[in-house]
Each structure stands twice: as C-alpha cells, then as structure tokens.
Amino acid sequence: MKGQRDRGTEGGSTGPALGPLNPRSLDPSPVLQATDIWRVFETGAERLEILRGVDLEVQRGQLVAILGPSGTGKSTLLHVLGALDRPTKGRVVLDSLDVFSYPESKLHELRNRKVGFVFQFHHLLSEFTVLENVAMPLLVAGMARTEALGRAHEVLEEIGFVSRLTHRPAELSGGEQARAAMARALVNEPAVILADEPTGNLDSTSAAALVDLMVRLSSERKMTILVVTHNQAVADRATRRLHLAEGKLSEEANH
C-alpha cells in the first residue's frame, strides 16, 4: 500500500526504486562550469570581496557538498550558480548554456527550466496543497494544470511521499516539508539541484532521511546536486567535498 511505503521511506534510509534516468544524464560533458567567479560589494570606500576567482566544474550525477565557516560566501556562490545573483566578473555555463549571456528578462525562464532550488526554509505556499506546491514550477511555466498535477504526482510517488498529497504545509512535519520541497525541485527534471542548508532545521531522523534521498537521487537518477551544508552526514556521503574560505574554493581529498 502507498501509505505503508511512505512510512518506510520518510523515517528510514531505504525507499522505492526511483524513476528512469533522464536521457541527458548519460551526457559525459560537465553539467555545470564556473570560471573566474568574482562577487564584490562596494559601499563607499569599502570593497568587500565575497567570491575571489572561483573555478568549479561539476559532472552529472555528482553530489557535491560545499563546506566552510558561516559568512564566507557559500550561499552567495549558490545564488550565482543558480542565476539568482549576477557575478561581478566571471562565467557560468549550465547544461551547455552560457547563463549570464541572457538578459535579465530571460533568466527567470532559464532558472525555472534548468535549476531546482531547496532552501533551509522550504517556502511552500501555505494556501496550496502538497501536490499543488510540487506542481508549481510547471504551472508557472505554462503547463496545463491536469498535466502538471499528474507530473507532480509521479515525482511524489517516485520519492515515496504520496500520503500527504492533499495536505497543506502547516499540516506537515519539518521532514515532510523538506521532502515536498525536494519533490518540487525535481518536478521540472532540472539540470542541477542547488540546496542551501536543507537539513538545517530538521531533527536527526528527518535529516538522515533527506540525506539518503539526495544520495539516491545522485546515484540512481544521476541527478546533480550541490548542497551548502554544515551537516557532517551530508559531507561524509557526498561524491565531492569543496571548502570555501576567504572567497576561494578548494577541494578536500577523497574520503
């Protein structure tokens, strides 16, 4: 029964087999390349260099943990990679698209098609059900409601979370909200998912379940996920661990 499957996956480390690979997941080219990224803020005579010549290349199917002290620019880097913020200097290529060659008016469409976002505060819309929240990126992109809801249902089924379809966010636990947010990030089959402290407000059981889901998505679906985190469990299970300090990005040794 579906309800039984939900209970097993929401609290544990195993779940149903995820859906078929997106054909582009077999493409050997990097899904994300950032070259000489600078983000500088100037206020009067003060110049604050948040990112200083960051270079990054990410292959499809990698789960990349971005670590570092608070206030070192990890979220800023994620925002630049996801085209939420323009770099002062540098280039980002996402799924073969030169992101910042597009005018501002086109960046929203690019983000909606190519990037799935998951944040510490999951920003589910309180007036809509779980199913409607997950379908929202498709509805915003103009997909017919019936088709969008159908696709959202498929994604929720894939991750083993169909027992709360008609519930609203206020009726969900923190872990359930996190799973709904991850499903919403997946619904467009994005090129990359960018997650900013997604386990930050979760208890240990819910955090472990979300980490397990991210690992399964990268290994079984070849989904590319970059996650800013202070959670050691995420770092321990990531494909790669990057460290950001003083505006510079370095890679930790394989573990």
Go through each PLM region and give its residues:
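ABC-family P-loop ATPase nucleotide-binding domain
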Residues: 1-5, 10-40, 250-255
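H-loop (His-switch) and adjacent beta-strand-loop-beta switch element
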Residues: 241-253
